[in-house]
């Protein structure tokens, strides 16, 4: 499938709705990422006066909020989008591989904290879970990534600091939540077996990525 060149957040939303799955950056499959299909002037650029501009990066919050869709580190520990149509199957398969963590485990404690507090930006959740010492940030991020890969945590939105002129700046912080809290338990329920969900996803990805090898697609599904 040849993907259209994308010039706007609206165009990206339409494509995600059409194909169901879209990694943000390099996916390991040539041409299959949001970065690959945006128009050249929507890519990352350094500004002459300092700073940077990256329209694609700024679209993420709009896409997640307005579609809506799921966003998180779903693809080989890298971020991407999944439409609500395909989320139940993806969730069904991934959770069969990664059962809900025990509440006594670190990952279980992180998930319970987020469920009890509601949405939190990453640093707030990290502090609430006691990961405040030296070197704790990277350790905490690895636990978060595992929970995102397992579909228990997603990004609800992106929060940006503002300068004295009330302009947003920086890379932004992920506002984290559980998919159940955002869209209800039914959004994560599927009437197929995990194997049936896997085969359905595999067949779909083969259709939209005819040049990708089976190994590449298997790696993408996880």
PLM-predicted stretches and their roles:
Residues 1-222:
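Long, low-complexity intrinsically disordered regions
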